[in-house]
C-alpha cells in the first residue's frame, strides 16, 4: 500500500497546482505590490505555518482543551498570547480568530446584542465591510449608523461624530478604517463613547504594525476591545487577533470565539503569528514601521504636487493614501487594470462622497508596507509614484507603457523578495 507520505513534494505530486503556486511566486517577485492590506512575510513565518501543527486539533484554550495530546500546541499558543500582550501592552489576548472579520464578529458578540445600535465608519468614507455594510453580517445583525468624514477636509470631525452619537445613542462605537490615511484620535473616540455610555471597539487591522512599533498612537488603553488582523503592516500570517484590558470582557471574547464562532483553532497559523509577534518585538521592527510611514509620505507627496491628481485629505499619516485619478483616466477600475498590465498592483477604491459606482470608483488606494518589506526606501517610493503617473497619463501609448514595465522590472530585480 502506498502511503500519502510517499507522494513527495507538491511539484512532483501535483504539477498543475505547483505551476499556479510558482506563477504566483513569480508575480510577487516581479510586480510592485501596493495593495495596502497586503505584505510579504518572512520565511520563518511561512515555515511555521507549513509545520506539523496543521495536523493537530485543539478545541478550547491552553490548559483547558477538549482533546488530548495538546501539551505541545499549548506551548505554541501560550507563546503567541504572551508575545501579543507584550507587543501591544494589553492584559489579555485571543489569538484564535481565523481572520479580522471573525475577530470583529467575536467582539460584537462580547459587547452587544442583535439589533443594538452601533456607530461605525461608513464604508464610503473609509470604513470596512464589517463596520456595518448592509451586505455583511454586521449590517444584517446589528443596527449600524455610519459616520463620515468632513466634506471639506476629508478627515474625521470628532465634534460632528459626538453630535451624531448623542442623536443615535449607540451601544457601541467602532473606530478604525480600511481606507483612511490620517491618524485616528482614540482618546477623543473614548470620550465620545463615555459621553453617551457606549462601548468603544477599535479595529486596528491596517495600522497594527505601526501601533506595535510605537509610530502610531495605540488604542489599547482607550478601547474596551481592540481587534486586528495579523498580516498587513504587522507582517504576519493571515489571521485575527483580539485584545482587551478587561478580564470580564476577555472571558466573553474567548467564549465568543470558541465555541461561539469557531471550532478548532488553526495552531499552525497561531505558530506563525507567534513568529511574527517575535519579529515585531525586535527593535529593528520600529525602523521598518517608520520606513513605511516615510515611504508612504514620499510617494503621496509626488501625487500632491501634480495637479492632474487629487490626494484625498491632502496627505497621509500612516501606510496608505487615496488618489482621485479621474482627471487622467475615466475611473479607478481602469487605472487598476492598466497598472496591472505594467506590473504594478493596487486596487480601485471609492473616495469620500463618491459619485461613481463602487465597481468603478473615482480613486485608487496605495499602500507601502510590502515595498518597504523588500527594502525599498524614499527614493524608490518616489520613483514608483512617477511610474504610476507616467502609465496613467499615457494609458493609450503602448511604447511608454512598455518603458514603465521595464523600469518596474529593474526595481524588482534590484530589490528581490525571496530570491536572494
Swiss-Prot record:
What one GO molecular function would you report for this record?
glycine hydroxymethyltransferase activity
**Binding, (6S)-5,6,7,8-tetrahydrofolate:** 123, 127-129, 357-359
Q: In which pathway does it act?
A: One-carbon metabolism; tetrahydrofolate interconversion; Amino-acid biosynthesis; glycine biosynthesis; glycine from L-serine: step 1/1
GO biological process annotation, one example: tetrahydrofolate interconversion
Locate the N6-(pyridoxal phosphate)lysine modifications and list their residues.
Answer: 232
What does the record note on quaternary structure? Homodimer.
The entry's family comment says: Belongs to the SHMT family.
Report the protein name in the record: Serine hydroxymethyltransferase
Amino acid at each position: 500500500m502506498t502511503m500519502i507520505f510517499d507522494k513527495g513534494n507538491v511539484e512532483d505530486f501535483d504539477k498543475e497546482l505547483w505551476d499556479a503556486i510558482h506563477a504566483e511566486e513569480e508575480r510577487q517577485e516581479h510586480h510592485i505590490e501596493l495593495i495596502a492590506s497586503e505584505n510579504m512575510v518572512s520565511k520563518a513565518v511561512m515555515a511555521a505555518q507549513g509545520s506539523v501543527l496543521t495536523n493537530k486539533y485543539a478545541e478550547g484554550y491552553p490548559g483547558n482543551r477538549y482533546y488530548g495530546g495538546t501539551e505541545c500546541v499549548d506551548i505554541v499558543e501560550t507563546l503567541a498570547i504572551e508575545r501579543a500582550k507584550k507587543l501591544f501592552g494589553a492584559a489579555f489576548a485571543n489569538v484564535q480568530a481565523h481572520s479580522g472579520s471573525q475577530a470583529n464578529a467575536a467582539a460584537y458578540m462580547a459587547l452587544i446584542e442583535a439589533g443594538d445600535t452601533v456607530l461605525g465608519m461608513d464604508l464610503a468614507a473609509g470604513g470596512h465591510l464589517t463596520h456595518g455594510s448592509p451586505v455583511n453580517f454586521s449590517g444584517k445583525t446589528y443596527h449600524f449608523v455610519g459616520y463620515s468624514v468632513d466634506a471639506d477636509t476629508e478627515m474625521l470631525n470628532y465634534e460632528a461624530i459626538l453630535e451624531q452619537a448623542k442623536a443615535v445613542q449607540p451601544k457601541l462605537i467602532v473606530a478604525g478604517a480600511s481606507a483612511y490615511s490620517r491618524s485616528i484620535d482614540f482618546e477623543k473616540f473614548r470620550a465620545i463613547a463615555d459621553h453617551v455610555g457606549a462601548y468603544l471597539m477599535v479595529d486596528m487591522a491596517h495600522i497594527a504594525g505601526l501601533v506595535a512599533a510605537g509610530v502610531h498612537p495605540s488604542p489599547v488603553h482607550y478601547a474596551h476591545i481592540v481587534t486586528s488582523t495579523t498580516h498587513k503592516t504587522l507582517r504576519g500570517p493571515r489571521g485575527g487577533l483580539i485584545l482587551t484590558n478587561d478580564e470580564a470582557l476577555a472571558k466573553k471574547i474567548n467564549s465568543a470565539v470558541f465555541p461561539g464562532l469557531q471550532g478548532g483553532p488553526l495552531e499552525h497559523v497561531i505558530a506563525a503569528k507567534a513568529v511574527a509577534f517575535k519579529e515585531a518585538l525586535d527593535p529593528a521592527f520600529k525602523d521598518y514601521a517608520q520606513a513605511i510611514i516615510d515611504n508612504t509620505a514620499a510617494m503621496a507627496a509626488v501625487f500632491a504636487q501634480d495637479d492632474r491628481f487629487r490626494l484625498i485629505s491632502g496627505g497621509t499619516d500612516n501606510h496608505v493614501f487615496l488618489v482621485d485619478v479621474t482627471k487622467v483616466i475615466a475611473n479607478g477600475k481602469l487605472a487598476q487594470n492598466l497598472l496591472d498590465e505594467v506590473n504594478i498592483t493596487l486596487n480601485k477604491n471609492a473616495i469620500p462622497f463618491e459619485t461613481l459606482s463602487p465597481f468603478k470608483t473615482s480613486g485608487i488606494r496605495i499602500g507601502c508596507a510590502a515595498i518597504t518589506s523588500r527594502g525599498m526606501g524614499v527614493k524608490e517610493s518616489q520613483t514608483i509614484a512617477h511610474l504610476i503617473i507616467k502609465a496613467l497619463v499615457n494609458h493609450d501609448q503602448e511604447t511608454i507603457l512598455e518603458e514603465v514595465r521595464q523600469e518596474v522590472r529593474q526595481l524588482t530585480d534590484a530589490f528581490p523578495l525571496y530570491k536572494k
